[in-house]
Amino acid sequence: MMPSAATVRAIYRCLLRDARELQRTPHFNIRRELKLEQWGVGGFVEPLPVQEETRGTNDPRVLTSLEEFRRLRDDAFRMGSPSIDVDASAKLDEAIETLSELSDQLLLAQCSSVTVTDGVRIEASSKYVQSHSNPASNTYRFTYRVTITNQNEECSIQILGRQYTFESEKGQRVALPRNSPGIVGATPLLAPGQTFEYGSGVDIDAPRGSVTGCLHAVRKTEDDDDGELFDVLVSKFALVAPHTPGNR
């Protein structure tokens, strides 16, 4: 069964809406999905291929789908009636998949932050865990991922501890105090260019909230192995439970 003109038009408009919203999002990049299994787990991350690092909002797959979908829409409605063949129908299926991915990426972008402090880049992202939440008892669980990259060229960075404050829109505050030791039981040493990431989580009493904090680090060089202590900022990032009562 061929898709109707109304279906084509509706999906096309949704694609453009989400794509435009993503393009307005600071520090946008294609992010991997957060998984509950990452909670309490950390490790070093292999560098991405160059083409993956530079995709950003110019993701060839996404932009190609949008451009082809625009052409499909224009061709279908130029004469006032759709003329969608089998190949075009397949393209429509691709557009629907792209729409789903764009929506997921948009929510991830809205729940992320990126900060660079003294050559250390921190990207933090969160995701609502519906399967472990109970809105009826005001329990909303979120998992979050923190990715640490040492962008310095002449020194290593060791993460010694952390401090976080979790706040809900109802005013609840959950504090992880300053100098809480390590991250997921480790004090990773990052050589120049290395990346370490870990996952954790929190329960709050509302479908919306935020996280702010810092990581305690020491800068180490060949001349000074004891190093210089400093804080690496983790900029505020949102906790958002989509499609919950009062949050639509």
Predicted regions and their residues:
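Short, surface-exposed linear segments at secondary-structure transitions and domain or protein termini
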Residues: S168, V184-T195, A238-R248
